[in-house]
């Protein structure tokens, strides 16, 4: 499972998850992607389950890119423990995902296969998602030039 090799601080505050993703919100590596429609925490186990669902469906046909990494430790106090006595021990790792974040990408497969793989993957996610395809945007200032005959 994914987790950082080293961290500067063992325990972190919970933080806020509101707002849209400004980074990681475009398809960068593959042709198709799974995009988050809401904010949430995605655990390392959920990321691994999603990766397995995608790779099992596409077999050896394509390539998968995981665009999120669980770098936030979540602490938990033991069961039946009285409150106080400090913050609990780190229990699991999560990736903080905001609205619009690209989480997984696929390349080298047909659009139908990619859509089905992402549909299966979306069942493993705790947030609402959508299937997106790579668009080749026209750079500002450029216009599409038709070939002269």
Curated annotation (Swiss-Prot):
PANTHER family noted in UniProt: 50S/60S RIBOSOMAL PROTEIN L16, LARGE RIBOSOMAL SUBUNIT PROTEIN UL16M
UniProt keyword Transmembrane helix present: no
Protein name per its UniProtKB record: Large ribosomal subunit protein uL16
BP GO annotations: translation
Cellular component, GO annotation: cytosolic large ribosomal subunit
Functional description taken from the UniProt entry: Binds 23S rRNA and is also seen to make contacts with the A and possibly P site tRNAs.
Record keywords: Ribonucleoprotein, Ribosomal protein, RNA-binding, rRNA-binding, tRNA-binding
Summary of subunit composition and partner proteins: Part of the 50S ribosomal subunit.
Chain's gene name: rplP
Family: Belongs to the universal ribosomal protein uL16 family.
Alphabetical list of InterPro entries matching this protein: Ribosomal_uL16 (IPR047873), Ribosomal_uL16_bact-type (IPR000114), Ribosomal_uL16_CS (IPR020798), Ribosomal_uL16_dom (IPR016180), Ribosomal_uL16_sf (IPR036920)
Species for this entry: Dehalococcoides mccartyi (strain ATCC BAA-2100 / JCM 16839 / KCTC 5957 / BAV1)
NCBIfam families according to UniProt: rplP_bact
UniProt-listed Pfam families: Ribosomal_L16
MF terms in GO: rRNA binding; structural constituent of ribosome; tRNA binding
């Amino acid at each position: 499972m994914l987790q950082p090799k080293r961290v500067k601080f063992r325990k972190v505050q919970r933080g806020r998850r509101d707002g849209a993703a400004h980074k990681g919100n475009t398809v960068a590596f593959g042709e198709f992607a799974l995009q988050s429609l809401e904010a949430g925490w995605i655990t390392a186990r959920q990321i691994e389950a999603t990766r397995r669902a995608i790779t099992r469906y596409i077999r050896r046909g394509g390539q998968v890119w995981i665009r999120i990494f669980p770098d936030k430790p979540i602490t938990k106090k033991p069961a039946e423990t009285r409150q106080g006595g400090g913050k609990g021990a780190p229990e699991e790792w999560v990736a903080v995902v905001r609205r619009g974040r690209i989480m997984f990408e696929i390349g080298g497969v047909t659009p139908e296969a990619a859509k089905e793989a992402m549909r299966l993957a979306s069942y493993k996610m705790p947030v609402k998602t959508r299937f997106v395809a790579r668009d080749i945007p026209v750079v500002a200032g450029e216009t599409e030039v038709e070939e002269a005959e």
